[in-house]
Amino acid sequence: MSNLSKGTGSRKDTKMRIRAFPMTMDEKYVNSIWDLLKNAIQEIQRKNNSGLSFEELYRNAYTMVLHKHGEKLYTGLREVVTEHLINKVREDVLNSLNNNFLQTLNQAWNDHQTAMVMIRDILMYMDRVYVQQNNVENVYNLGLIIFRDQVVRYGCIRDHLRQTLLDMIARERKGEVVDRGAIRNACQMLMILGLEGRSVYEEDFEAPFLEMSAEFFQMESQKFLAENSASVYIKKVEARINEEIERVMHCLDKSTEEPIVKVVERELISKHMKTIVEMENSGLVHMLKNGKTEDLACMYKLFSRVPNGLKTMCECMSCYLREQGKALVSEEGEGKNPVDYIQGLLDLKSRFDRFLQESFNNDRLFKQTIAGDFEYFLNLNSRSPEYLSLFIDDKLKKGVKGLTEQEVETILDKAMVLFRFMQEKDVFERYYKQHLARRLLTNKSVSDDSEKNMISKLKTECGCQFTSKLEGMFRDMSISNTTMDEFRQHLQATGVSLGGVDLTVRVLTTGYWPTQSATPKCNIPPAPRHAFEIFRRFYLAKHSGRQLTLQHHMGSADLNATFYGPVKKEDGSEVGVGGAQVTGSNTRKHILQVSTFQMTILMLFNNREKYTFEEIQQETDIPERELVRALQSLACGKPTQRVLTKEPKSKEIESGHIFTVNDQFTSKLHRVKIQTVAAKQGESDPERKETRQKVDDDRKHEIEAAIVRIMKSRKKMQHNVLVAEVTQQLKARFLPSPVVIKKRIEGLIEREYLARTPEDRKVYTYVA
């Protein structure tokens, strides 16, 4: 054990020790190292670096920094670089101000960058240690800062550089060819001199460039506007924007693209939006009038670049669209054809839908504006709901020529677009019910499928409450068909005769159909009256407790008519007749399709040849308004439908006028439909007032029901809040006025459904 300890002890005594590196150097030696490095730096700046040993220079720089002489090395470097840039480089650049300035500056910049890379490599250890410890700029950046301050930003060099670049760009804008590479190099230099920032580039070039550009484009805009149409101006602005983007891409820093484009947009678009849009014979309205979708698309694309650009376009488009719409719906020309009226609106909508798709990129703002405009002018005319229903009526009737089912479907879809814009949907519903009833009862529907498809569209739009009555009408028609089959079987089984009358009865549910509460009187002739009484007894025997009321205004009849007189030509000679069934030399037979009122009038003439207006009124008991309309259809309609003659021969029906059968009546058709006067023109003024009164009565009930529903749920509400809630609930059908809502609230208070609170009379409570 003792030997081991000795051995261990002797190894410890002979262990090597490393002596600490001396931290101080002789000043003379330090100066000699610096002189060596200084000379090398100067040689590099003079581009005489071929004989230098970079390894030796690195080692000497390393030694200086290691021995805490980094500050001397850093300060010395700054002085040497500064001296070279001031005495040599700056002088060369100043001498070139009037000759090859950019090339000289660019060469000096490239040489300086190359030199600083070499110097940085030599002084790499100083960058890693001294620069990090003392938080100063690294070698390369120090070189950039000195070049920036002593050369590029030196008084007249800075000004001359800026002016040279601006002049070159101005010349290029005028069409001259310039050295783009020189501009690009100068801009890259300014960006690098910003040391990862844009300040140098921005202050020395970009800011004055944008200012100069604004002045240039301001003058150019005046020239462009004076010399060009709107579409050409737009194309020139587009070209100018593209040119500036292309210049940035090839010459300037990419960060300049956004500000220069904004300058162009401000000077060429924003400041002149109204002028461009309203240009006479070439602006937006001109483009819309002439369907210039491409020009509109160019304008949209350009104006979408600037704030409020699309708003300016929209406002101008809206003014034009409203003018067009108001002209279409104006009530000046009474007797306007409803089908043409709606078709005109649909054509206008199609035009603007095309602009929306092809020119305005289906833009939401334009879409909403167009919809708002259509809603505005469609509701200016109180007859719009009636006319829309008549338009649909026309498309769903049998005999619409040249339209496939798919085409009818497309038209109905377009009609539904107008329906959505309509505020008085309840008025439309009332008219639609009337027109549907007429189609169903006269068997004029093109098909049940088309009818049900239309009702389905209305249901999707407004809900099942809106269409429940319309669907009920179809159920009634189906049940009536079954009832008539049973009635005919009953007649066969009992041998009861209807006296030659082919009777079809439709039993209608009062709530579904547009029946009249006060049914117009009419003395039905004995034969059809007798036939109906047989049906009445049959029906009531099956359905005890029910009541049947004849709705004369909804009925129709086919009459066998025989005309005996000769047909005369204008020269007085008599002619035979083609088309009618001729039984004798001059006897002609036709089937006349007429209303119940017209049938009642015509069957009088089986008894006598002549009747005065008063006699017809007394015999038939038809209300005067209905009688006048029926007689106008029979005696004052088209010659091919004039089955009665009237004395005197005027278009008006008045007391004392005498009516006889027109024995000279002829038609190429065996089956002649006697049109009701003005049937396609919509209701007369008195009828419209009556319809409006019925609508107003219905609305009172709907408003009251909505008020009660809301108050039952909320119990207590302030007046304005209740009015707003009621309006919100009913707007899908109509827009109730606050005045009407207030009246209905007062009515409910009187009937003790609601009460005012004692502390605030504008607050209501629900009375359970």
Curated annotation (Swiss-Prot):
Domain Cullin neddylation, residue spans: 698-760
Cross-link Glycyl lysine isopeptide (Lys-Gly) (interchain with G-Cter in NEDD8): located at? 712
Question: One biological-process term from Gene Ontology?
Answer: inflammatory response
The Gene Ontology CC terms held by the record are: centrosome; Cul3-RING ubiquitin ligase complex; cytoplasm; glutamatergic synapse; Golgi apparatus; mitotic spindle; nucleus; plasma membrane
* Associated pathway: Protein modification; protein ubiquitination
* Tissue specificity field: Widely expressed, with highest expression in brain, spleen and testis. In the testis, it is mainly expressed in spermatids.
Q: What Pfam families does UniProt report for this protein, alphabetically?
A: Cullin (PF00888), Cullin_Nedd8 (PF10557)
Location(s), subcellular = Nucleus; Golgi apparatus; Cell projection, Cilium, Flagellum; Cytoplasm
What domain of life is recorded for the organism? Eukaryota
Which GO molecular function, any one, fits this protein according to its record? POZ domain binding
- Where in the sequence is Phosphoserine found? 585
Give the chief site where it resides.
nucleus
The protein's matches in SMART domains, at most eight in alphabetical order, are given as: CULLIN, Cullin_Nedd8
- Compositional bias segments (type: Basic and acidic residues): 682-698
> Which positions bear N-acetylserine?
2
The annotated phenotype of a deletion mutant is:
Null deficient mice are not viable. Extraembryonic ectoderm shows a greatly increased number of cells in S phase. In the trophectoderm cells are blocked to entry into S phase. Embryonic stem (ES) cells form tightly packed cell clusters with prominent actin cables and aberrant adhesions. ES cells are retained in proliferation, yet retain their pluripotency.
Q: Which keywords appear in this protein's UniProt record, sorted alphabetically?
A: Acetylation, Cell cycle, Cell division, Cell projection, Cilium, Cilium biogenesis/degradation, Cytoplasm, Cytoskeleton, ER-Golgi transport, Flagellum, Golgi apparatus, Isopeptide bond, Mitosis, Nucleus, Phosphoprotein, Transport, Ubl conjugation, Ubl conjugation pathway
Q: Quick one: where's region Disordered?
A: 677-698
Q: How is it modified after translation?
A: Neddylated. Attachment of NEDD8 is required for the E3 ubiquitin-protein ligase activity of the BCR complex. Deneddylated via its interaction with the COP9 signalosome (CSN) complex.
- InterPro entries (alphabetical): Cullin, Cullin_CS, Cullin_homology, Cullin_homology_sf, Cullin_N, Cullin_neddylation_domain, Cullin_repeat-like_dom_sf, WH-like_DNA-bd_sf
Ranges for region Interaction with KLHL18: 2-41
- Subunit structure and binding partners: Forms neddylation-dependent homodimers. Component of multiple BCR (BTB-CUL3-RBX1) E3 ubiquitin-protein ligase complexes formed of CUL3, RBX1 and a variable BTB domain-containing protein acting as both, adapter to cullin and substrate recognition subunit. The BCR complex may be active as a heterodimeric complex, in which NEDD8, covalently attached to one CUL3 molecule, binds to the C-terminus of a second CUL3 molecule. Interacts with RBX1, RNF7 and TIP120A/CAND1. Part of the BCR(SPOP) containing SPOP, and of BCR containing homodimeric SPOPL or the heterodimer formed by SPOP and SPOPL.
* PANTHER family attached to this UniProt entry: CULLIN
What is the annotated role of this protein in its UniProt record? Core component of multiple cullin-RING-based BCR (BTB-CUL3-RBX1) E3 ubiquitin-protein ligase complexes which mediate the ubiquitination and subsequent proteasomal degradation of target proteins. BCR complexes and ARIH1 collaborate in tandem to mediate ubiquitination of target proteins. As a scaffold protein may contribute to catalysis through positioning of the substrate and the ubiquitin-conjugating enzyme.
Q: Which family does it belong to?
A: Belongs to the cullin family.
The name this protein goes by in its record: Cullin-3
